[in-house]
Amino acid sequence: MQIKTFALSAAIAQVATLALADTSANYWQSFTSQINPKNISIPSIEQTSSIDPTQECAYYTPDASLFTFNASEWPSIWEVATTNGMNESAEFLSVYNSIDWTKAPNISVRTLDANGNLDTTGYNTATDPDCWWTATTCTSPKISDINDDISKCPEPETWGLTYDDGPNCSHNAFYDYLQEQKLKASMFYIGSNVVDWPYGAMRGVVDGHHIASHTWSHPQMTTKTNQEVLAEFYYTQKAIKLATGLTPRYWRPPYGDIDDRVRWIASQLGLTAVIWNLDTDDWSAGVTTTVEAVEQSYSDYIAMGTNGTFANSGNIVLTHEINTTMSLAVENLPKIISAYKQVIDVATCYNISHPYFEDYEWTNVLNGTKSSATASGSATSASASGGATTAAAHIQASTSGAMSVLPNLALISAFIATLLF
């Protein structure tokens, strides 16, 4: 029955992907890109080949045959996505006006308290009318026609490998290590980082990672107006398409801050949220907490791979692609691989065959990651561990320096029935 349960979850995920395809006049088809995602050739320059952060993070002008960025057509980098007049541009207004805003949930824009934290004062956490994750960690919307957030991998003893905030200019050693270990992750890219470091985004696709959206400027999304929320989504989608030739169907809210208003707006662009059920808090190491505390979180979560915690389903773990966290990831990945049967990206763990709007089929498979990434025999295991140590040392230096078709519902029902019975 466990196999059937997973198969059902995967089937539902695939159906949901298809069901959200025809939204807002297929806005993504208006995006342009000079990139063929099935055949990307990244220029060999110091920034793409070096593992010295100083060289990696030196500004470069992208090859015009691959990536052309006209600043007048984009929001200001790292500012809310309606800046630079984008909320008044014909391009954005075309998408905004294609949405029937009378159907949007009547949920107020959230505010911050004096300390800059989301103010949950007065919110009814018992009834949680808005499915506000920040207040209650709710992942099942209270309104219809919106997908549930994805928050865990359905397959038992599975580590859902995800990294936020990329592409980071100093990620070469980290991506090299993932490639050596044949590990694929869900990479949640920030639009501003994509246009700053387009070759980094291209590498994510070349290496076979699942690319998803993490907004344009990394705001607390429930504090933004409807226009601002839509713009954060829209321009991140446009940026990822420009740099990679692909438009994601999945996104992750910064800080996990999402409610049914934000979900509804995301759904108008065919986007489904991916949350997590374990948080390493890795970004805070040496900032608001100690490195030792983050290492303990890793150790606790690694132990869960063998102590029965995930005997019936897996996890999705929040980690980050930033200067202070990539070395922690590399140090812990060999132990994660040893403790879990699967270490895989979200698209694979949910058996999502088309994680992008374009005709680009996902071919990563269950059980493929660990068998190829885990050493068989003590000698090879030692080699894998050594590789982790070497990569971590390099990364540590940076801390100091398609056409979519709606499914036939009768066929879907019949298929799910065969899984259940």
UniProtKB/Swiss-Prot annotation:
Cellular component GO terms held in the UniProt record: extracellular region; plasma membrane; side of membrane
Protein encoded by which gene: CDA
Residue ranges constituting the NodB homology domain according to the UniProt record: 157-349
Signal peptide start-end: 1-21
Organism: Amylomyces rouxii
Membrane topology: Lipid-anchor; GPI-anchor
Reaction(s) catalysed (UniProt annotation): [(1->4)-N-acetyl-beta-D-glucosaminyl](n) + n H2O = chitosan + n acetate
Higher taxonomy: Eukaryota, Fungi, Fungi incertae sedis, Mucoromycota, Mucoromycotina
Name of this protein: Chitin deacetylase
Known function: Hydrolyzes the N-acetamido groups of N-acetyl-D-glucosamine residues in chitin to form chitosan and acetate.
Residue positions of the active site: 164 (proton acceptor), 320 (proton donor)
